[in-house]
Amino acid sequence: DEHPHFSWHPGMLVPDCHMQTVFLKDLVSAVAPTNPYSFVNYLVKHKKFYRFLTSRLRTVSREEFSDYLRWAAEDMNNLYFSHTVENIDFDKKRRLFLVQTSQGEYFARNICLGTGKQPYLPPCVKHMTQSCFHASEMNLRRPDLSGKRITVVGGGQSGADLFLNALRGEWGEAAEINWVSRRNNFNALDEAAFADEYFTPEYISGFSGLEEDIRHQLLDEQKMTSDGITADSLLTIYRELYHRFEVLRKPRNIRLLPSRSVTTLESSGPGWKLLMEHHLDQGRESLESDVVIFATGYRSALPQILPSLMPLITMHDKNTFKVRDDFTLEWSGPKENNIFVVNASMQTHGIAEPQLSLMAWRSARILNRVMGRDLFDLSMPPALIQWRSGT
């Protein structure tokens, strides 16, 4: 890893920001619950098991989950930080991958790519500045918002977390706060019991065999199971607004602006002018803001360290890998050498693939393939829902 030490989304570790998945969906518990790197063992080792239970938390804060991951990482002796991977090639004589880093070279029979996604900004954003940036950098920048007009763009969980903290004055008391979303409302995360079935190995098994157009349709239908806002967050925001305006009778300096896309962003004096288009009535509006924060999600991006291997890799299209069920890429090298990839195959593995929900199962699937045997028992119980026909 190129970073000097372990850090998990440090820019989004803002106060009162919680995970969307239950704490048992940790590094190991789903496949090896007695493994010492379980979240429960983390609680025991830190002498807070009973207080955690008394707190009755179904989900934990992002700060605590980050601390759990850091604790696990610091106990492992095979993690190398401050190592920037510069190129990966395949040595035909050794029949091994050659990983070239800023600190030296490594040979491996198999490699796993986990470089993740890149922050997405709308096309109208030409570059980031101190007053216009992506939400993933909020806690790294910690700007002073005192007396400023603030606009948060994005109607998902990250947008909600930033809006709530700005509302509470976490970075100073703002003069005005706007929350803009393309969606027609600030929609809740779908946490229904049967929706959670999308985040199971059984569902992935059925999903991956469907035709491509059907998979795309299903991903669109299931979007709110991963991209919505938790009911707790929405209720907290609503109560904050009620208390501020109906009880304290403060000036209404908050604007909630759904059904709008930011089409143009222009510098305007020390701040910014946003031009927006309303999806439902086709109206056009402008908005002046001193600070604009884009909570607009992430985009898939091919790793920049693969120019030597790319001619050997079979692509689904120019920006998407062709990924098998066991998370290996199709490539023209020896069959005993595998290129695994994670967080890069939602189109084939379903809505759960980029999420933490199946992290332990996915890792076990990869390790079983590497070892050539079932190191972990991943056999599935009878399905609760018959996702596919019997034909």
Protein language model regions, located:
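Flavin (primarily FAD) cofactor-binding/catalytic cores of flavoenzymes
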Residues: 1-4, 8-11, 52-157, 161-391
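N-terminal low-complexity, Ser/Thr- and acidic-residue-enriched intrinsically disordered segments
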Residues: 1-29
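A conserved beta-strand/loop capping segment in the N-terminal third of enzymes
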Residues: 31-63
